């Protein structure tokens, strides 16, 4: 979870979850960092949408360290590993993802009006369609086994789009 310097429509936090291998990332803007939010997010965006993970690694923030999360992880038999407090390098994947997302959001917020919360879906889409150096593939292509079709390609059809 990452605090954002300037509030946007009352949102001050971004809850970020990343799948370790594919680098697929889901986010949700938060007004408050509460326990119930983390449990709902894990269930709705990871368990129900993809599958029950064998384990999750989280920081020690309120959205992940609470009874609601503990109960849902116990119910689905998911092991919960926590990164070392005050040692961000202990969860390098999360730190790298957060850094990249904040960079994308900051750039979009400078170029467009409406605050970062309205740009979060666009930033997430940009992150998902970009190849990662570790895998040489985009998270989108690893999850869906196809390349992203951008809105520009739909408006100006390319040979690739015409053959789909």
Residue ranges and their predicted role:
Residues 1-164:
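Integrase module of LTR retroelements
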């Amino acid at each position: 979870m990452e605090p954002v310097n300037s509030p946007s429509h009352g949102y001050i936090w971004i809850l970020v979850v990343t799948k370790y291998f594919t680098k697929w990332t889901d986010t949700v803007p938060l007004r408050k960092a509460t326990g119930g939010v983390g449990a709902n997010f894990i269930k709705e965006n990871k368990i129900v949408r993809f599958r029950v993970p064998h384990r999750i690694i989280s920081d020690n923030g309120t959205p992940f360290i609470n009874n609601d999360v503990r109960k849902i992880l116990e119910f689905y038999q998911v092991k919960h590993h926590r990164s070392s407090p005050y040692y961000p390098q202990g969860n390098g994947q999360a730190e790298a993802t957060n850094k990249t997302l904040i960079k994308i959001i900051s750039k979009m917020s400078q170029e467009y009006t409406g605050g970062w919360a309205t740009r979060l879906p666009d930033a997430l889409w940009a992150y998902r369609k970009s190849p990662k150096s570790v895998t040489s593939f985009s998270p989108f292509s690893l999850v869906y086994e196809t390349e992203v079709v951008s809105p520009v390609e739909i408006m100006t059809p390319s040979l690739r789009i015409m053959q789909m």
